[in-house]
């Protein structure tokens, strides 16, 4: 029996022992060393050969990732680690650090209970470190810290033991400041990364060594020894004395929770159902014999097996051949194969129980974030939808070069939308021109070149990237009448800006899109009031959609309840295209103040009510001082001081605003905010301006008003592009 086969047998046994399972992720800023760390953990556990680790990047098993040298999709693997004479099952997920792939990070966080946050000793805490930490804490995932690339502080920056400790303390303090700011109230103190108890490790993933304070005490290695090993180029010996996988996995087992502990506080956070119900209690207890409840965290497309769903189970168990029910898509499915992940391979097992991460085939309609349960005990409601900190901000139009490829292209686009819910796909079968919206240039490039070109074998023409704008209002409209085509139904409404605190709660995911078919639910009302909406309005909200809401302030109109669903549909159609450039509207509250309907139901059907509301909403928005909003990115540039002026000039030339500047040694850090529309070609330009000596990163920072002097020009460009008549 080979080493891997033994490992599989051990995994099967340990899957049933909850206190010996750790579901953990590795997350960090791009290039801080996540995948190298993952590989060396796998090598230490005997999953891949030690010689290949680091170069092999076992988790970067997609050709595109290997070519770019960055992790694009989150990969999963299960392995066994022995600690204090006991064996533990570690389910490990490696997540991408590149800002364009933030969606994968969000989805991975739903599957795990703890995370090793990797931070580069040279660069320190970077914007993406903060973003992944925010995602983790929002999902109640407990963090521990690994400070990587310590050898560079010694060999390149020549730091003394005192300076080394100073640098570590600064990074730890910054991470703890973020944890204090963003952690759930009850964990603000408990979850701080404390060096003494061993919640922080230091080392070099590339050279395969790490230490922590408890490990130093056990092994007698000091900071001075580490400096000697690095300076004398004996990091191999150091790796024998302080192996990376032992230190990191010991830290994970000691400080990260097992599924039993974690589900007690994670379930109420991600599931809003009745905690006293059978299934509620079963999930909190992580009961393998309870009703089935799980969430799909990722869809992986395998050339042979088709769509594979990575799934975290919170309750019950899945066996091969079980009938399943997908709550979001309201579809039945069957578990054709049940397996565990071993990097790029999957190993079939007879069944998987609560607290584990597994691979399922047969869920054809599943999307990332889908709730899985049994058809005999449907989980109502499903799990909270996955909210991302970024939004798609760039769109490209693509067309198949060959018309015969059209049906296949449409199929692939639908598949991409299922796999990655940060991609928006609009399929236009009439014109053959399809729109893909993504998080940034790289995200779009990977979709068009890799997913469509390489995997799908379809040649496509890709249009120029288009920036996604939004529209909102700055004033209140007069009372507007929306009339049905037959003139027998009239609805009166006012458009006004949504309360700032309520819109902020929407952006943070505290309130979300929802139609209240009969009346506002108690839970929905409570959340709206908490967000700052007046109680009287909160209990009259009919629908929240794309960051807009409609509130029914009428009284005693009998037919209104019958027409409620049609009014909601008309409202949605009304805010899909704004008056300035037919871009989506956000941040608008429509107050319905009066209505008259024809007595005869035949004369107040969908063909009458929907257009009446749609025209009314559009007219009200047009008369409430509409403005264009453009997507912004926070841009961080880390550059030698000699090039600081060039870096700032590059930002200023792109309508950017410098928000903050810091000096650190001979490096300058420039923090700025730049419109996405001005960011095309930035990578090449900033490298040229600083002769390739700078590090830079961007992340989406929301929408802001387009400067008044530019608005007419931009609106005209968008209208011309869409073939709309100029206003």
Swiss-Prot record:
Residues 19-260 form the tr-type G domain. SUPFAM superfamilies: EF-G C-terminal domain-like (SSF54980), P-loop containing nucleoside triphosphate hydrolases (SSF52540), Ribosomal protein S5 domain 2-like (SSF54211), Translation proteins (SSF50447). Its main location: cytoplasm. It is found in: Cytoplasm. The keyword RNA-binding does not apply. One of its GO terms (cellular component) is ribonucleoprotein complex. InterPro entries: EF-G-like_DII, EFG_II, EFG_III/V, EFG_V-like, G_TR_CS, P-loop_NTPase, Ribosomal_Su5_D2-typ_SF, Ribsml_uS5_D2-typ_fold_subgr. The keyword Secreted does not apply. Disulfide bonds: none annotated. One of its GO terms (molecular function) is translation elongation factor activity. The modification Diphthamide is found at residue 603. Keywords: Cytoplasm, Elongation factor, GTP-binding, Nucleotide-binding, Protein biosynthesis. GTP binds at residues 28-35, 94-98, 148-151. CDD domains: aeEF2_snRNP_like_IV, EF2, EF2_II, EF2_snRNP_III, Elongation_Factor_C. It comes from the Archaea. Catalyzes the GTP-dependent ribosomal translocation step during translation elongation. During this step, the ribosome changes from the pre-translocational (PRE) to the post-translocational (POST) state as the newly formed A-site-bound peptidyl-tRNA and P-site-bound deacylated tRNA move to the P and E sites, respectively. Catalyzes the coordinated movement of the two tRNA molecules, the mRNA and conformational changes in the ribosome. NCBIfam families: aEF-2 (TIGR00490), small_GTP (TIGR00231). Belongs to the TRAFAC class translation factor GTPase superfamily. Classic translation factor GTPase family. EF-G/EF-2 subfamily. This is Elongation factor 2. It comes from Methanococcus maripaludis (strain C6 / ATCC BAA-1332).
